[in-house]
From Swiss-Prot:
Function: May be involved in the salvage of thiamine breakdown products. This protein has a haloacid dehalogenase family domain fused to its TenA domain. Phosphatase with the highest activity against thiamine monophosphate (ThMP) and, with a lower activity, against thiamine diphosphate (ThDP), flavin mononucleotide, inorganic pyrophosphate, CTP and dATP. Has a thiamine salvage hydrolase activity, but only against 4-amino-5-aminomethyl-2-methylpyrimidine (amino-HMP) and not against N-formylamino-HMP, desthiothiamine, thiamine, ThMP, and ThDP.
Catalytic reaction(s) noted: thiamine phosphate + H2O = thiamine + phosphate; 4-amino-5-aminomethyl-2-methylpyrimidine + H2O = 4-amino-5-hydroxymethyl-2-methylpyrimidine + NH4(+)
UniProt-listed InterPro entries: HAD-like_sf (IPR036412), HAD_sf (IPR023214), Haem_Oase-like_multi-hlx (IPR016084), Thiaminase-2/PQQC (IPR004305), Thiamine_Salvage_TenA (IPR050967)
Keywords of the record: Cytoplasm, Hydrolase, Mitochondrion, Multifunctional enzyme, Transit peptide
Entry comment, domain topic: The thiamine monophosphate phosphatase activity resides in the HAD domain (297-571), while the TenA domain (85-292) has thiamine salvage hydrolase activity.
Transit peptide location: 1-28
Name of the featured protein: Bifunctional TH2 protein, mitochondrial
Length: 617
């Protein structure tokens, strides 16, 4: 059991830390402990920089400047764009040419709207340098239109044939031109803009609607370009990718952001809120544009849509995969806060408990022992000969050592008595207020609500108390999750300190995983099914590899070190999907995903999982 000692105690009079999403969480993974606490937030992402670092390379932006902050804040929309069927097929190079022709025709309407919007914005700017900068941006758009003319020639698009604007294109262009004309909620009507300063706001608002598109295309170009190799010299869309990954386009995107920052620097909080809303709306409309492109070909994404005829069995770890805090820290917090402070308050209690001060010291000792012994166990595993190729049997044997360690650690916890006297209602209340990783509960909710989808959700966890997990998911309206964890034993709703030990090691997890799948096979012996496992630690490694798709969320270094030692490959999910798409054809009969391949797919947010599995709402 990966357990953590709380680093900061809360007020003795309440379980305030457990009940408020705005307080400091006393948790750290034991083998990544730091002096500073983690802050619990309902919007805390798994990674604090733009949640792509283990999968997608984000172009650098200043996190201190407004454009950088907005890009980070609305990165979810960026993910839905890059994981769109259109974008995946384009990156893979097997997008049907007719689809690309239609896209180019629609994009021309976008660019013409950009050029007009820049023209209007330049008229509103009251600074000569700003006017010149906007004029330069307009020139870049005109150059891009010329590039589209070359695309027209390369792909035999009839430029004399009038191409109707689709609804997604129309929504964005109308939004952009309305913004550039000053028709913005919270802004004076165009005819009532009395001063040059007021007109300058319109220029800033226009940049707020343009910037996300520029940054998104710069990001897509860089990401697609990074996937090209020498063997892709004949990639049909290399010219498009080269354009948007070029230094010139990256500089143009940066110039747009810099100008937005300059124009907004003197704005009030309310005016900055308007820019944020415009930025978000532009990102949303871009997502809709990508998903509106008509595709008449099989695609890898979204996963669940393509496997709607199959049974789906989806597994997830809990601690630090679904949660921001480790459940052991929560249980330790409850134990310490509710423990008697002196002999007088201890008298008459149903179950004899340690004093709070003794309990704190005991938790400190258990934490120290766990940290030291865990590191020793991992190093012992890594001291064995490194595998030349994927060695599942060798990994299983090595993890038996870690399993023995985890069981012994649980023995020490039980024998110490630190889990005695916890009230079941306090545990459930803590679970209801437990902050989950941003986007986690949305994925589970969406899966359960999707019609014509035969899916099961299972949580496999080392957590000492399954009631805590069930309460956390129930609070999010996800009652259909099957929880496989350890359980406290209770006497009249008070914990005895004993644990019903069901899942306490990597081997136990793998056994539970296989048992669930075997039962599914026995029930539906003629029907195929797809298994997905989502985890973050060494304890999840066997299940991740056994699953048809193993997704690693913001993994610990121990997971990567141990996995790599036994020949496991860690591939960014988007890169893996593009490779799968290259092999995905009309004739593809079997699933592209198979367990025990030795490959795991890395993501750094649940939003990325959502984009891949479920697609755009």
């Amino acid at each position: 059991m990966r357990f953590l000692f709380p680093t900061r105690l809360i007020n003795n009079s309440s379980l305030g830390l457990l009940r408020s999403p705005h307080t400091t969480a006393p948790i750290r993974s034991l083998w990544f402990r730091t002096k500073s606490p983690v802050f619990r937030s309902a919007t805390t992402p798994i990674m604090t920089a733009v949640a792509f670092s283990s999968s997608l390379s984000i172009p650098p932006t200043s996190e201190e400047a407004l454009p950088g902050k907005l890009w980070i804040k609305f990165n979810r929309e960026c993910l839905f764009s890059i994981y769109s069927p259109f974008a995946v097929c384009l990156a893979a190079g097997n997008l049907k040419i007719d689809t690309f022709r239609q896209y180019i025709a629609q994009d021309v309407h976008f660019l013409k709207a950009f050029a007009h919007a820049y023209e209007l914005a330049a008229d509103c700017a009251d600074d000569d340098d700003d006017k010149l900068a906007i004029s330069d941006l307009r020139k870049s758009v005109m150059e891009e239109l010329k590039m589209h003319d070359s695309f027209v020639q390369d792909w035999d698009l009839d430029i004399n044939k009038e191409v109707s604007v689709n609804s997604a294109t129309l929504r964005y262009t109308e939004f952009l031109l309305a913004t550039a004309s000053g028709k913005v909620e919270g802004c004076k009507a165009p005819g009532m803009l009395d001063t040059p300063f007021e007109k300058t706001k319109v220029a800033a608002y226009t940049l707020g609607a343009v910037t996300p598109c520029m940054r998104l295309y710069a990001f897509l170009g860089k990401e697609f370009g990074s996937l090209l190799d020498l063997s892709d010299v004949n990639h049909p869309y290399k010219k498009w990718i080269d354009n948007y990954s070029s230094d010139a386009f990256q500089a143009s995107a940066k110039q747009t952001e810099d100008l937005l920052e300059k124009l907004s620097v003197s704005m009030t909080g309310e005016e900055l809120d308007i820019i944020e809303k415009l930025y978000q709306q532009a990102m949303k409309l871009e997502v809709e544009f990508f998903h509106a492109q008509p595709l008449a070909q099989p695609t890898i994404v979204p996963l669940l849509k393509n496997h709607s005829k199959d049974d789906l069995v989806i597994f997830s770890d809990f601690d630090l995969t679904c949660t921001v805090v480790d459940s052991s820290a929560i249980l330790a917090e409850i134990a310490i806060v509710t423990a008697p402070k002196d002999e007088q308050s201890r008298s008459g209690q149903q179950i004899h408990r340690m004093l709070s001060s003794d309990l704190k010291n005991t938790w400190n000792l258990l934490s120290k022992q766990y940290t030291e012994h865990y590191e020793e166990c991992i190093e012992s595993i890594l001291n064995k000969k490194k595998a030349d190729k994927f060695d599942y049997e060798g990994l299983c044997k090595a993890l038996e050592q870690l399993s023995d360690f985890e069981k012994e650690a649980n023995n020490r916890v039980i024998e110490s008595g630190v889990l005695k006297g916890l009230n079941l209602e306090d545990i459930k209340r803590a679970g209801e207020r437990l902050i989950l990783q941003d986007g986690c509960i949305n994925v589970f909710q969406k899966i359960l609500k999707t019609e014509n989808l035969n899916a099961e959700l299972h949580v496999l966890s080392y957590c000492w108390c399954g009631d805590l997990i069930r309460a956390a998911f129930s609070a999010g309206g996800v009652d259909a999750v099957e929880v496989h964890a350890n359980e406290f034993t209770f006497e009249e709703s008070i914990s005895t300190g004993e644990i019903e030990r069901k899942v306490e090691s990597p081997i136990n997890k793998a056994q539970q995983f296989k048992s669930i799948l075997q039962n599914r096979k026995n029930e539906n012996n003629k029907k195929s099914f797809l298994s997905v496992y989502i985890g973050d630690s060494v304890g999840d490694l066997l299940c991740l590899l056994e699953a048809d798709i193993g997704i690693v969320v913001s993994s610990s270094s121990s997971l990567r070190r141990v996995g790599s030692h036994f020949g496991v490959s860690f591939v960014p999910l988007f890169s893996g999907i593009v490779q799968k798409q290259k092999q995905h054809t009309e004739e593809s009969s079997s699933s592209a995903w198979k367990g025990l391949s030795g490959t795991l797919y890395t993501v750094s947010s649940w939003a990325e999982i959502h984009s891949f599995a479920l697609g755009w709402e």
